């Protein structure tokens, strides 16, 4: 009897072992299947990410029609075959941007974008300094520096600081103005445009022409920055307003004036009380638009060329804006401020003496 019981227990145990072994094999197979699915899903997401970036370039780049896209997709996908993460596609995207040939399209990783969103102070950087002064003889001088922040609180601060400075200078009743755009390498144009708006005599002074021939003009009114009739951003300026008298204005430019710095300069082209003193600008006069990708990276594409109030197109990379009154051999250096300021004063006095 005991032997029979022992035998039954052994048979039951063997069955249990078989069940456990089956479950382990099944679980192992299931885990392997899930791993394969996960790897496939990861591979698919990498491919989709790269495709999204390439699709944006093909659809939005101003030079899209000049490129062999079938070949570009093929080469990019081949380069991404061994990509293990989305970050592995960044060099491929950057390499493709170079093929666009506009010298202005860029890629910003999520980490770089995060720094732009945090702004200057939260990343341990100094907020751009705006120099201003009433020069001997009663001439107002103000500097508009580069501005590379996507922090909207800092956008407001940038404009309010500039407006405070020009309001203070205007209260001194200057004979004329010098707006210094030298070495303004660009950054965010909306706050720059809002800053200089009190000096502009009309709307539709700066815009772009896209690859389909459509014009888009930027404007600033009642604290809002517009693209055509679409309000893109509402500045919080606390009701602050500035009015500048119509008098001679000299815009100081050099080879370090680029991108949004050039757009600011071009905003004044064709305005009668404006003169340009310095050297030619950088020549990055294309219009860019940022696109947020799935992981938070920014793909910034050149989608058009800058146009002035007369719809003159600034399409040639490197040509830049030419000064009315050249200062020879200054390049990027501002060590010869005396030469710039002396010429600016001379131009202002000439304008004042001309009926």
Model-identified regions with their sequence ranges:
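Short alpha-helical "patches" and their helix-cap loops
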Residues: 16-17, 71-74, 209-214
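Short, well-ordered loop/turn elements at secondary-structure boundaries
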Residues: 13, 136, 245-246
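Short regulatory "switch" loops immediately downstream of catalytic or recognition motifs
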Residues: 1, 147-149, 306
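C-terminal "post-core" interaction segments
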Residues: 33-60, 87, 181, 185-355
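Bacterial Sec-dependent N-terminal signal peptides
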Residues: 1-36
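Terminal targeting/pro-maturation regions of precursor/exported proteins
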Residues: 31-178, 354
